[in-house]
């Protein structure tokens, strides 16, 4: 990665293991150099739209798919997510990943949760993905000493 500025993190752009792979790749490629593709489909519900976009927060958010055919609500979610990404991209670029906590055992049928904390000296972004049977992960310990700005 010293010879190029960016690389696509994986070919797994539409599977449920996107955030798991993207977090693992952070151990070898800086998130600022890792393109994470959010593939948006017109048939996706709002939960899937959020899931795909927030996965992109684990690196350089890239968007593809049927963006011109998205329902209005999903398009607004995409616009809001891009705006929020713009507010936190300096943490992705200049920060360090201090926590990758994932209790998933099967990438093809993930159950559980994943928590990723990326921080600078004064700011942090906590990215949480839940999978089947993964509701209410233990995030409180990762929020200690931080003031929550947005949820």
How would you describe each model-predicted region?
Residues 56, 126, 151:
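Hydrophobic, well-ordered secondary-structure elements that form the walls
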Residues 30, 94-95, 145-147:
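Glycine-centered flexibility motif
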Residues 105-148:
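Carbohydrate-binding surface patches
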Residues 53-102:
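Catalytic cores of secreted or luminal carbohydrate-active enzymes
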Residues 1-69:
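Glycan-recognition surfaces
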Residues 5-7, 67, 103-106, 117:
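Solvent-exposed, flexible loop/coil residues
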Residues 4-8, 75, 144-148:
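Short, low-complexity, polar/charged sequence segments that are solvent-exposed and flexible
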């Amino acid at each position: 990665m010293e010879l190029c500025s960016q690389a696509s993190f994986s070919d797994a752009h539409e599977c449920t293991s996107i955030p798991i792979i993207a977090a693992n790749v952070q151990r070898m490629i800086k998130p600022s150099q890792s393109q994470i593709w959010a593939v948006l489909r017109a048939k996706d519900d709002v939960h899937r739209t959020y899931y795909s976009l927030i996965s992109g927060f684990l690196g350089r958010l890239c968007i593809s798919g049927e963006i011109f055919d998205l329902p209005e609500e999903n398009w607004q979610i995409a616009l809001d997510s891009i705006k929020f990404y713009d507010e936190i991209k300096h943490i992705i670029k200049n920060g360090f990943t201090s926590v990758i906590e994932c209790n998933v055992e099967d990438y093809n049928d993930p159950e559980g949760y994943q928590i990723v904390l990326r921080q600078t000296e004064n700011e942090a972004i906590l990215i949480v993905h839940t999978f089947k049977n993964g509701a209410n992960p233990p995030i409180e310990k990762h929020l200690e000493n931080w003031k929550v700005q947005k949820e």
